[in-house]
Regions:
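Short, structured segments at the rim of ligand-binding sites
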Residues: 1-146
Length: 146
């Protein structure tokens, strides 16, 4: 295959799309942080009823790293910042056991260079048992705290 870069645009996702890939929305929220412009996700009310309230939990993460967003029960708007400054920022996720939120926080940390502390990370094995080994192959670095 040949891969070429192009102008990346913000995501505009409707409820119709949500039905077929709702588990990927936390990751799309994370990626949207670095896209220029405003990404809009509509019809996402069911995210509040997953292993955690994924709208609320991703909002907490976005707030920690200084990403502007608007969230309601059925919509999320993320004001992306491709020039995000990482100094003095850290992603902390604790008290939840949602594998999708934990994976999305880890990937956001890798994309931005922001350090993260993710408790209950073993929950990632629920949907992706090889997640850490895959990240290691992609030059990610994780340290386990005791």
């Amino acid at each position: 295959i040949h891969v070429k870069s192009s102008n990346i645009k913000p995501l505009k996702i409707s409820k119709k799309f949500f039905v077929s890939c709702q588990d990927e929305f936390p990751l799309m929220f994370a990626i949207s942080c670095l896209l220029p412009g405003i990404s809009v996700f509509r019809g996402i009310e069911d995210l509040a009823n997953k292993e955690s309230n994924r709208i609320k939990e991703m909002g907490k993460i976005l707030k920690q790293i200084g990403i502007k967003f608007f969230a309601s029960k059925d919509e999320m708007r993320i004001y992306g910042n491709p020039y995000l400054k990482i100094k003095n920022k850290k992603i902390n996720v604790s008290g939840i056991f949602d594998h999708r939120i934990l994976m999305s926080a880890a990937i956001l940390s890798l994309l931005t260079g922001i350090n993260s502390k993710l408790k209950n990370f073993e929950q990632v094995g629920t949907s992706c048992p090889n997640f850490l080994s895959t990240i290691f192959k992609l030059v990610g670095r994780f340290e386990r705290e005791n």
